[in-house]
Amino acid sequence: MTGVQTTAAAPPQASPRVKRYLPWVVATALFMEQLDSTIVNTAVPAMAAGFGVTPLSLKAVVASYILSLAVGIPVSGWMADRYGTRRVFAWAVGLFTLASALCGLAPNVPMLIAARVLQGLGAAMMMPVGRLAVIRTFPKTELLAAMNFVIIPALIGPLLGPTVGGLIVHWLSWRDIFFVNVPVGLAAQWLIHRYMPDYRGEATRPLDLVGLVLFGAGTALLSWLLEIFGEHRLDLGAGVALLALALCLLAAYGVHAQRSEFPLLRLVLFRVRTFRVAVVGGFVTRLGIGVMPFLLPLLYQVGLGLPAWQSGLLMMPAAAAAMGMKLIATRVLAVFGYRRVLMANTLMIGVTMALFSRVGPATPLALIVALGLCMGFFNSLQFTSMNSMAYADIEPADSSMASTIASSMQQLSMSFGLASGSLVAAWYLGAVPQTDRAAVVSALHHAFLALAALTALSALAFRGLKPGDGDQVAGRGEPAG
């Protein structure tokens, strides 16, 4: 998934040395980004204790990173075309590394959130541009092997992140989870300047500044409103006025995108039914799925009183099951088809999320592990299905923009889901201190049930698919015609 607009030119002849080491360069950056995105969740209770705040109030530390990813991804393509892949990739890794150090040094929550925004902006440019360099370097006959090597860290990072985070917090300090990125980032910079090719677009499209302001301001304001709604920091009148402003900004972007020759996101692609169903259905589904990696460590540490390292270990089964599902997902789709898989699997995710509402201090660890395995198994099948379905009927010339839209919507839905899930938990917790374990467990149980219901209802969105949709992608036979 990339936000880069590639040219139609064939890849240039890269040297054997570049081909040998470029996948390592991109994989190193991806590992750093994926590790950081999962390592933070386990450390939230320790951060809260260090800053003297409640764990739920730190949702913005996670949401700000995801939101800046959503806003920054569409700009990455323009940056690479204008300034070149080597320079932009080096900037992105440098910004991510610097922001990681600033996170570790942050004296208060606002500074930590600001540093996380910078981290997200670096990550938003880092991976799309890295993938573009790989695509432009390798011919089609070698591209699959190169891309498979590059995405391995995307699978390993979520597996190691919670455990590494838990161990670092337990034996060192939560600040050290950010300092881990510094030596990796410095090593990546050395590799970039030695082995990263420098590609530029043949014809740079103008940057849609108006669209960027409208889309960025609207989504940021809406996410912020969801974040603070449960904290009662705004009266009803001000909240309604700001909500109306956020919706007006997004509506204005919709009008602007229809009229602009080079919009930030080409909304006309939503006329493609399979793309529309996959992205919209996936948006609603991820509202529930995206918040679980944040709420589960709170349940384990704050609610059940488990140490950070044990909480991290309990997150590993989901990542392991997700990797296992990757081996059979293609076969499942080939046998049952996209429509049946997405509808049934979405319901199973909802059921699994609801079952977490039964987890309490007396629940055997084996049962918690089993639920984690189920969650990872179903989530992996869902992401594989939605991500591939989105491009089933997209023309090759539109694939880059379609990927940009899908990537931005994915991050945006996770940001909104995190804010919404935390809002539900805070709403049920009320004025009860978050040191009251029984109250925290009860509030989180209510959040799980609400998110489970929302996720299950999102299965209805996939009814918009036809039985034969995606059959060619799934390898179920020749397309009808």
Question: Which residues are covered by each model-predicted region?
Answer:
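Helix-loop-helix hairpins in multi-pass membrane proteins, especially solute transporters
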Residues: I73-V210
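Hydrophobic/small/kink-forming positions within alpha-helical transmembrane segments
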Residues: A70-V71, A101, L155, L159, ...
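Hydrophobic transmembrane-helix bundles of small-molecule transporters
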Residues: H170-G281, L306-P307, L314, L451-A452
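12-transmembrane solute porter fold
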Residues: K19-L35, V40-T42, F51, P55, ...
